């Protein structure tokens, strides 16, 4: 991982620190350009800001930045600019990856930061995978191999999903996901951006079910992390993820995705829908609008021009984003639940707390299916503008 990042970003020095069970950080890997006097990149200031506090560092002109005047070890080494990204997932911090330059002309721009965020996301997934694998080996030596793999995959996937919804001024939020097997091909994220002034909502559904689908879901999460972190728009995220997913997967592997950014001050909703079931925008007056696809599924074609659309969310309006596991839930006679019934339930409960809206949807699907087993994963994200 460090070598790949080093070759792509051309720094003078790079390092990966990993958090130990004791809470200390161990230098797991490092690299310097040929001919550079080898000095370990050690900075308590950098570790505190990035590895412990989870902040992304992008500094040009380190010696002139008062925020970094305490980073004496790096200043003594002649470091002029740096980018550093935390290694983390929903279960907590894992460490950090950092790149530095001795040149007064910084080689690190937004593109390089985005690349490092993507590398960190993939690295975090692999590190957590290794940690969970070690735990599984220690605790489950007598468990069947297939069962161990499924449980491990489930833990990884739960780690990808939000552990809770963030609190964002101006919005009420709720998200939930249920697999039809041990592991799921559904994925969602709710991410505050631009200092809490913007909210990004993403719901994705990869082709297939079970272990293979969950691994593809993990790849999708890693590919989307960088563009989301640096503030890309919904259509830009679709473009970038679609191309990279096509390059990294075999024929027939793809994902659908609904992604939207919401501005709390203006109430502006901007969305791109890559082959996903239409989202619903239900007004406070009960009128429902379908937010249909603006492009094909991600990874299906190499060159695809996605588009995005905008709507205004008035006070009390409800955004409903879901995967087709809800609308395609079937009863014993193979009749599907359908979008019309989902819309009706959401309209009838639109003034309720969002957790109660989600419970009403799940209850109504259960009454419709009457015990018939679910054939697909089910994910539902609800967003209401409150002020």
What are these regions (language model features)?
Residues 12, 137-320, 371-387:
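… and, occasionally, acidic/histidine-rich disordered N-termini of signaling adaptors
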Residues 65, 73-79, 107, 251:
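Short loop/turn motifs at secondary-structure junctions and domain boundaries
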């Amino acid at each position: 991982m460090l070598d790949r990042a080093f070759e792509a970003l051309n720094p003078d020095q790079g390092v990966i620190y990993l958090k130990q069970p004791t809470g200390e950080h161990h230098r797991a890997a490092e690299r310097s350009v040929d001919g550079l006097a080898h000095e370990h990149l050690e900075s308590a200031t950098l570790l505190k800001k990035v590895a412990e506090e989870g902040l992304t560092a992008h500094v040009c002109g380190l010696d002139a930045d008062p925020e970094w005047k305490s980073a004496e070890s790096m200043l003594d080494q002649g470091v002029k600019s740096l980018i550093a990204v935390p290694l983390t997932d929903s279960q907590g911090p894992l460490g950090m990856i950092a790149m530095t330059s001795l040149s007064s002309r910084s080689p690190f721009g937004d593109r390089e930061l985005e690349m490092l965020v993507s590398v960190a996301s993939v690295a975090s997934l692999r590190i957590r995978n290794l940690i969970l694998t070690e735990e599984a080996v220690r605790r489950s030596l007598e468990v069947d191999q297939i069962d161990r793999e499924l449980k491990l995959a489930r833990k990884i996937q739960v780690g990808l999903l939000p552990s809770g919804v963030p609190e964002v001024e101006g919005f009420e939020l709720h998200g939930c996901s249920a697999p039809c097997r041990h592991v799921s091909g559904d994925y969602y994220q709710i991410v505050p951006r631009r200092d809490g002034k913007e909210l990004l909502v993403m719901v994705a559904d990869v082709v297939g079910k079970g272990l293979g689908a969950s691994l593809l879901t993990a790849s999708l999460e890693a590919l989307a992390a960088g563009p989301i972190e640096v503030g890309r728009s919904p259509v830009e995220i679709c473009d970038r993820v679609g191309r990279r997913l096509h390059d990294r997967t075999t024929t027939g592997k793809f994902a659908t995705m609904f992604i939207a950014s919401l501005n709390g001050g203006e109430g502006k909703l901007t969305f791109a829908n890559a082959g996903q079931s239409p989202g619903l925008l239900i007004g406070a007056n009960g009128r429902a609008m379908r937010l249909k696809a603006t492009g094909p599924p991600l990874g299906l074609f190499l060159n695809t021009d996605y588009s995005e659309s905008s709507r205004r969310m008035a006070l009390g309006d409800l955004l409903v984003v879901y995967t087709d596991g809800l609308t395609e839930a079937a009863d014993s006679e193979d009749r599907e639940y359908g979008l019309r019934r989902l819309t009706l339930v959401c309209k009838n409960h639109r003034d309720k707390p969002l957790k109660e809206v989600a419970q009403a949807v799940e209850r109504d699907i259960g009454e419709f299916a009457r015990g018939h087993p679910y054939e697909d994963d089910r994910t539902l994200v609800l967003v209401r503008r409150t002020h």
